[in-house]
């Protein structure tokens, strides 16, 4: 029987990162940067106002007090986007908007809140110092500064920075394309009538969502019955359109209707095994299709499929993008109740983190089919293979499901 760590290591050793591509900023969203980005121009590119107010020479406000304000003539206005060259005469001011270029001769901005808001003459009730409310050119980044290092995931802030730096495209590894489907004669599409012995198919929706949350471009196919020919046809079709295939069901140990296993054993490129874990013991990994597309075959019980995704599919997605971040960050929390675990298997029990994530409460529904109980959980409690019980007050390793 394989260990959890050994099986994961086998998967990660076989995954080859996707080739970097030149992507527009829109298409790079969720991708992983494959080049260092340096500033070609100063950020911001020019001195500008950090507030709505009045551009002044700071020395002209030195005598201002609330009881005896300094009054200056307002000789015009500078708006954001104004490309004209404005010059500030001594003893005067210019009304200025946030982001507008600082006029020549000005060295400070008086926020409008510190004035009477005048349009032809303005009373200033307190002095300002040179540099107040001014955003200096290059104050955020100077030319040659590294703005973003290769290997980071491109999300809202990095993409905003790239745009602010004038970049329209970047070299990045794209979001992996993932195809998910489930197998089983018992499965019916949600929203359709079901007879006794049938259930609504849920795993493909859950796993596709989990893949998107993990940074993939994921889609699902309708479930297929326990027919190896149909399963193999779907796998061969999807392999040419995806970077990773994920199946659910059809891999149990000794089952007579294990269509996924029967289909893939014809190819001889996927290895099925038992992994010493609960839930999720039956697993399979290999490659399919002319492009050797990786495939992970997960158990059919919903909780088993979800835990398997967290432990094996999510790290595989990160490996496809060439990231070196932690595949499964863990923390430690105090148990609020005792628990039991089978010997020789690493257990992943559902629990609820509380008290600022310092305590963990095991849930009562721990069976591998209990999806409603999983929906109440926000963490997995990791119980090592050699531990069969833990007591209230013991410190447990936990995996947060909120990240």
Regions found by a protein language model. Name each.
Residues 2, 21-26, 34-35, 48, ...:
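Flexible glycine/proline-rich
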Residues 1-5, 168-298, 302-308:
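Helix-rich terminal scaffold detector
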Residues 12-19, 36, 58, 102, ...:
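Structural signal for hydrophobic packing residues in well-ordered secondary-structure cores
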Residues 1-69, 154:
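Intrinsically disordered, low-complexity, positively charged segments
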Residues 29-42, 83-95, 142, 285-294:
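Short, hydrophobic/aliphatic alpha-helical segments
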Residues 47-49, 62-67, 85-89, 102-104, ...:
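Solvent-exposed alpha-helices and their adjacent loops that cap or buttress functional pockets
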Residues 2, 54-225, 360, 364, ...:
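Short, glycine/charged-enriched hinge/interface segments at domain edges or termini
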């Amino acid at each position: 029987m394989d260990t959890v760590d050994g099986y994961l290591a086998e998967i990660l050793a076989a995954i080859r990162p996707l080739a970097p591509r030149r992507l527009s900023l829109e298409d790079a969203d969720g991708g992983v940067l494959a080049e260092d980005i340096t500033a070609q121009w100063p950020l911001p590119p020019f001195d500008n106002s950090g507030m709505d107010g009045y551009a002044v020479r700071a020395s002209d406000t030195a005598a201002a007090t609330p009881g005896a304000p300094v009054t200056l003539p307002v000789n015009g206005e500078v708006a954001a986007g104004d490309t004209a060259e404005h010059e500030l005469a001594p003893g005067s001011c210019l009304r200025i908007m946030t982001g507008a270029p600082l006029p020549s001769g000005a060295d400070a901005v008086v926020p409008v809140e510190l004035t009477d808001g005048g349009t032809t003459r303005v009373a200033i009730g307190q002095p300002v110092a040179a540099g107040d409310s001014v955003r200096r050119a290059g104050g955020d980044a100077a030319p040659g500064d590294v703005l973003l290092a290769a290997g980071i995931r491109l999300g809202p802030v990095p993409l905003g920075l790239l745009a602010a730096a004038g970049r329209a495209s970047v070299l990045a590894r794209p979001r992996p394309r993932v195809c998910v489907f489930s197998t089983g004669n018992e499965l019916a599409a949600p929203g359709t009538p079901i007879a006794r012995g049938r259930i609504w198919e849920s795993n493909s929706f859950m796993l596709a969502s989990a893949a998107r949350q993990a940074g993939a471009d994921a889609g699902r196919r309708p479930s297929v019955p326990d027919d190896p020919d149909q399963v193999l046809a779907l796998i061969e079709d999807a392999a040419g359109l995806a970077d990773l295939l994920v199946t659910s069901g059809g891999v149990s140990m000794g089952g007579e209707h294990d269509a996924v296993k029967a289909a893939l054993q014809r190819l001889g490129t996927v290895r099925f095994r038992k992994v010493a874990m609960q839930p999720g013991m039956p697993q399979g990994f290999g490659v399919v299709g002319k492009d050797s597309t990786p495939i992970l075959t997960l158990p059919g019980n919903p909780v088993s499929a979800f835990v398997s995704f967290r432990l094996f599919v999510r790290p595989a997605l990160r490996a496809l993008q060439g990231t070196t971040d932690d595949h499964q960050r863990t923390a430690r929390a105090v148990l609020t109740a005792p628990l039991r675990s089978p010997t020789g298997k690493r257990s992943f029990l559902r629990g609820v983190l509380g008290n600022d994530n310092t305590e963990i409460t095991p849930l009562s529904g721990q069976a591998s089919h209990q999806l409603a109980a999983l929906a109440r959980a926000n963490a997995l409690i990791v119980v090592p293979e050699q531990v069969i019980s833990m007591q209230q007050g013991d410190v447990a390793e936990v995996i947060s499901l909120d990240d």
